[in-house]
Amino acid sequence: MSNNYSIDLKQGPSLLYVIPIKPVVLAVQLGAILFQFKSIYDFEYNFVGDLVFRTFVIFLSLTSFTAFLFNQKILMKAHLVMAIFLLAGPIACLQYLVFDFYRAEFHGDNNLKWDHTSSFENYLIFILVILLAVALGSYTWLCHLLIEGLDEKNAPKRRPQCKICSNHYVVPENEKLIYNIA
């Protein structure tokens, strides 16, 4: 097997210098794939297009899972762009809910009929949409950190220019001097 397709879950950046990011991202993706497989069996199909669309989404999810598993940078970046576009949905929904709630409370005009729901349900909707937006944003940030870590791993090491940073630089064997300069 070539070096490009190595599966090392601990390589790359870590969260708080303790938790490697790659297993967290892969676990979230695997959970999403399992949820999509489960939703295929629970969904009532009105026409074949529904089944084809859901199968295509599962194929895209499996492709992004293998891209993150084998460090395929182009597919990882495509998945990141898709996640950013998907993040716009909960944010737009949250903005709509906030503006509609404001309009219902202060102007008496509402589209979502807040009068028929309890205040607990209103707050639950807000909390769930906020949690969804935070979860998608955190996942997108972790994917971005993983791609940046892959870029830094492949980048050539440069010698630091200042004396303060030179203590942290590991000199390669081919650049070491014969005599130590103190």
Curated annotation (Swiss-Prot):
Pfam families, sorted: DUF5373 (PF17343)
Domain of life of the organism encoding this protein: Eukaryota
Matching InterPro entries: DUF5373 (IPR035321)
Protein name per UniProt: Uncharacterized protein C48B4.9
